[in-house]
Regions:
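Bacterial N-terminal signal peptides
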Residues: 7-16
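Bacterial N-terminal signal peptides that target proteins for export
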Residues: 1-7
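Transmembrane beta-barrel domains of Gram-negative outer membranes and organellar outer membranes
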Residues: 20-280
Length: 281
């Protein structure tokens, strides 16, 4: 009987350890870091669909190579490409030019440092910093230079030996964008949260939410828009391979086409779908 109890405890501890470095979300970042010397390659594919009228499809392709440096520090590099297909598109207020284009969109570098571990401490806490350069406008698909400095405060709390994973991110992203030869500033902010439940040893199901806004010229008293997304997330992991699918419809936004509340379809879309496929070495 004691042997059975020991085996059950060992199994629970092992399952928690194996799940310690999972990222079961498509949009929400976890507080885990890769073990020293471990590599991970992830392909991110995000489809953004639907404006007020017309045909709109934006595709973001991000190839990530990640490396654990120390027990608390990891770094990564991203190579980004984008595809846009726009025809007769109107947003809440903006009219977009027709476009059918695929192109290289620059890259970025990630630095993530873990202050508290979600497995060994009361909760997980990490700081994330990602400077990057873009050569294609994310919404319109036009050529244009921008430099971003994404900074994230990451909180994570695990329950039931890691069977339930919850996480919260506060995102601050200053941006420099070149317009007609001059550099203009913008500040984006987002609050994201997620919960993921382990159904089987390999499958997780959960939900993610994001509230995003932006402040032109970094003036905090003049928000450009608000957009709230909420949707399900499905995660699969077996050995060193994993995949995550998040379906993210916009639930509410401001201003809409009437200038009130509804869906904001200038800086955001009706629906986002993100697929992450990765393998660890």
């Amino acid at each position: 009987m004691n042997r059975i109890r020991i085996a059950l405890v060992a199994s629970l501890l092992a399952s928690g350890f194996l799940a310690a470095h999972e990222e079961p979300f498509g949009y929400v970042r976890g507080a885990q870091t890769e073990p020293p010397g471990e590599w991970e390659v992830t392909q991110w594919t995000t489809a953004r669909m639907g404006k007020e009228s017309g045909h709109y499809l934006g595709m973001d392709f991000n190839t990530e190579i990640e490396l654990g440096i120390t027990r608390r520090l990891q770094m990564a590099a991203y190579l980004n490409t984008r595809y846009h297909h726009l025809r007769d598109v109107e947003g809440s207020e903006e009219v977009f030019e027709d476009r059918n284009r695929f192109g290289l969109d620059g890259g970025s570098v990630e630095i993530k440092y873990q202050l508290l571990s979600p497995d060994n401490d009361a909760f997980g806490l990490s700081l994330y910093f990602e400077p990057g350069y873009h050569s294609i406008r994310g919404i319109s698909g036009q050529s244009g230079s921008s430099i971003e400095f994404e900074t994230i405060l990451i909180l994570q709390k695990n329950f039931f030996a890691g069977r339930l994973v919850t996480a919260f991110n506060f995102v601050v992203e200053p941006e420099l964008e070149r317009e007609d030869g001059d550099w203009e500033t913008e500040l984006e902010m987002a609050w994201t949260a997620g919960a993921s439940w382990r159904l089987t040893p390999h499958w997780r199901i959960g939900a993610e939410a994001r509230l995003g806004t932006a402040f032109p010229h970094s003036r905090l008293n003049s928000a450009e828009y608000l957009a709230f997304f909420l949707g399900p997330a499905l995660h699969y992991q077996r050995n060193s391979f994993f995949g995550t699918l998040t379906v993210f419809p916009q639930i509410a936004g401001w201003p809409d086409a009437q200038g009130t509340g509804g869906l904001h379809l200038d800086e955001t879309e009706r629906l986002e779908i993100r697929l992450k496929l990765g393998i660890e070495f």
